[in-house]
């Protein structure tokens, strides 16, 4: 949650924030503050992995004076990274913050909590998204420690180009689901 505290301090109040599906973005919903509506765009209950980046591009086109920040995990951004070419070609200057934990975080947390840490298909290998962004002609920033996020966000917004901030997140820091939140889905077998 330290990441979101830092973002609260550095994001301009006119920011529009787009969220993806997944546990890191669920945390962001509660941890960030939103001003100047419409300022929060999320697929919350629909599980649209990869939604945030494309949504951010659309919000920026509709509201060009707003600072637009898209928050996503590495899995979701990996699905939609090719849209960077659209952002660069048309000058759609958003900032995408990729919380890179080298896993499908929601699935991994679910497997940890409900399947005794028996992980299947939860870990992924993601590229250095900051470097990939630069290959597309966007700006790329790497954040290895939370203390570096403010400077990276300021530089990304100031760059006036599509920007990607690749943030290293501890893959063991999983956001657990409440065990009772799925109780209604249990089937009783006799």
Residue ranges and their predicted role:
Residues 1-54, 59:
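Active-site diphosphate/adenylate-binding microenvironment
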Residues 112, 146-190:
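Glycine/aspartate-rich loop-and-adjacent alpha/beta segment that forms the canonical ThDP
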Residues 7, 17-19, 58, 74, ...:
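Buried hydrophobic positions in well-ordered alpha/beta secondary-structure cores of metabolic enzymes
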Residues 25-26, 47-49, 77-78, 102-106, ...:
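Short gly/pro/ser/thr-enriched loop/turn and capping motifs at secondary-structure boundaries
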Residues 62-152:
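Conserved thiamine diphosphate
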Residues 42-46, 116-124, 189-190:
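A short acidic, glycine-rich active-site loop
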Residues 12-15, 35-38, 63-68, 89-95, ...:
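Short coil/turn connectors at secondary-structure junctions
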């Amino acid at each position: 949650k330290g990441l979101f505290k830092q973002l609260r301090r550095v994001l301009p109040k006119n920011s529009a924030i787009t969220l993806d599906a997944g546990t890191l973005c669920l945390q962001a919903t509660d941890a960030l503050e939103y001003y100047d509506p419409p300022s929060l765009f999320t697929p919350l209950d629909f599980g649209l992995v990869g939604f945030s980046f494309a949504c951010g591009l659309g919000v920026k086109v509709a509201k060009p004076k707003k600072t637009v920040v898209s928050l996503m995990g590495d899995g979701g951004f990996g699905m939609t990274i090719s849209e960077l070419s659209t952002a660069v070609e048309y000058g759609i200057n958003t900032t995408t913050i990729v919380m890179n934990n080298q896993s499908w975080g929601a699935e991994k947390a679910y497997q940890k909590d409900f399947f005794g840490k028996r992980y299947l298909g939860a870990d992924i290998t993601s590229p250095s998204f900051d470097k990939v962004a630069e290959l597309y002609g966007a700006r790329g920033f790497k954040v290895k420690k939370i203390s570096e996020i403010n400077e990276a966000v300021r530089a990304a917004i100031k760059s006036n180009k599509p920007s990607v901030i690749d943030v290293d997140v501890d893959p063991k820091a999983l956001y657990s689901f409440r065990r009772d939140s799925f109780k209604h889905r249990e089937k009783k077998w006799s």
